[in-house]
């Protein structure tokens, strides 16, 4: 979007078609009437709904419906398994969608990877696809699995990985509950883990890591080339990234004797680039900053001991850098 201002008749406002800024609105063409989103059904579903709500795009969905509703008239979408999203984005059924990097790679999907969104079902970190065997297995390396059977949902990626290791083995598709297939139904498995707890619970041992993966937003190439759709995708990305950046942050504001600011800043390295404002008492200042929420319990007592008053901690919904 570019905005030019000036005297009436000398300036103009240009908006990507279909966007609204303040009271200005340019209707979308029929071609770009709705941005069709592919949302992940299954393990990522609840985390995705929460993220969209924090980003300002609440998604309403009944328990039996795969057709979500949005309060933004420019959006439409469907819930579908994350394994399939990239394929449908490539083929143009969805303009964009959220899926895992692993499934983009598995499907060899020809899509635009717009951004990473580092969140998952249970944590705010990347997941890993790992090669596992039973704790008592004699297997120590991938080479020890030559001629053996490996079960996984990520078949093509696993086959390519073993080929790169120079190992010939049988890779078979698993419909789920992959951890229980060793040792009776398979010699090893390739499975995804966030924390490693399920691997330990099933008495498995990691032999190697195939890849790291996280959620990504991908776009159809034609949709990305459409100015109106691209602008809407970029708006969604900005807000999603802002919500993710803010999830472990809080705002902190307090009043402080001006003479103590340098000392307080030195004692609290994370208190960098704070906003400092004058107060009616020239000897005092108001300080406002953003910190990691997990540091607040250490910061606030330190600030109080340094003479700070009126300390307020408040939640942050979005943080846009």
What are these regions, as identified by a protein language model?
Residues 133:
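Acidic, glycine- and histidine-enriched catalytic cores of nucleic acid- and nucleotide-handling enzymes
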């Amino acid at each position: 979007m570019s905005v030019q201002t000036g005297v009436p008749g000398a300036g103009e406002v240009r908006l990507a078609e279909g966007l609204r800024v303040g009271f200005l609105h340019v209707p979308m063409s029929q071609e770009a009437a709705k941005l069709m989103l592919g949302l992940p059904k299954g393990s990522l579903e609840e985390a995705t709904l929460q993220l969209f709500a924090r980003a300002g795009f609440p998604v309403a969905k009944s328990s039996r419906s795969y057709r979500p509703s949005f309060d933004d008239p420019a959006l439409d979408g469907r819930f579908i398994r994350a394994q399939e999203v990239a394929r449908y984005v490539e083929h143009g059924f969805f303009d964009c969608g959220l899926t895992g990097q692993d499934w983009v790679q598995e499907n060899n999907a020809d899509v635009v990877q717009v951004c990473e969104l580092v969140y998952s079902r249970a944590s705010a970190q990347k997941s890993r696809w790992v090669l596992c065997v039973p704790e008592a297995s004699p297997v120590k390396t991938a080479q020890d699995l030559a001629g053996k059977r490996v079960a996984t949902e990520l078949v093509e990626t696993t086959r390519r990985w073993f080929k790169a290791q120079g190992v010939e083995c049988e890779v078979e598709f698993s419909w789920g509950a992959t951890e229980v297939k060793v040792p009776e139904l398979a010699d090893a498995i390739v499975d995804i883990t966030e924390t490693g707890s399920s691997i330990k619970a099933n008495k498995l041992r990691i032999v190697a890591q195939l890849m790291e993966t996280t959620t990504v937003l991908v776009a159809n190439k034609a949709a990305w080339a459409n100015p109106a759709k691209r602008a809407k995708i970029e708006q969604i990305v900005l807000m999603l990234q802002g919500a993710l950046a803010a999830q472990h942050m809080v705002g902190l504001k307090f009043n402080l004797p001006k003479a103590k600011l340098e000392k307080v800043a030195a004692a609290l390295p994370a208190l960098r680039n704070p906003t400092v404002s004058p107060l009616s008492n020239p000897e005092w200042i108001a300080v406002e900053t953003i910190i990691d929420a997990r540091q607040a319990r250490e910061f606030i007592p330190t600030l109080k001991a340094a003479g700070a008053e009126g300390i307020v901690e408040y939640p942050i919904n979005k943080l846009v850098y």
